[in-house]
């Protein structure tokens, strides 16, 4: 049963990423804007998340997104909400994966 929790947590994490990537893509942010870089980091995380069933495999990309957020985005309320949602989903997936072991 624990493997189902890990799988569903990873699926939820991937869905969270898609939920934030799609609207940003539709907005077509200006090149080199905060939104453009944020979208690039989200896409990198999504690529890693879809390549592996393990949430741990995404840690490096999440660290990159976190560093970008801390350095650049902290004063943008919309991107802050997006970042916090993605981070919470990743942490949930990690906890579910760890409890399965």
Predicted regions and their residues:
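Short, charged, amphipathic alpha-helical segments
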Residues: 31-40, 59-60, 84
């Amino acid at each position: 049963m624990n493997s189902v929790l890990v799988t569903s947590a990873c699926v939820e994490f991937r869905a969270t990423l898609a939920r934030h990537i799609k609207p940003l893509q539709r907005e077509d942010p200006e090149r080199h804007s905060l939104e453009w870089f944020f979208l690039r980091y989200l896409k990198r995380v999504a690529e890693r998340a879809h390549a592996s069933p393990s949430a741990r495999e995404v840690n490096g990309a999440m660290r990159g997104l976190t560093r970008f957020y801390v350095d650049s985005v902290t004063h943008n309320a919309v991107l802050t909400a997006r970042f916090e949602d993605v981070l919470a989903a990743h942490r949930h997936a990690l906890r579910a994966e760890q409890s399965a072991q």
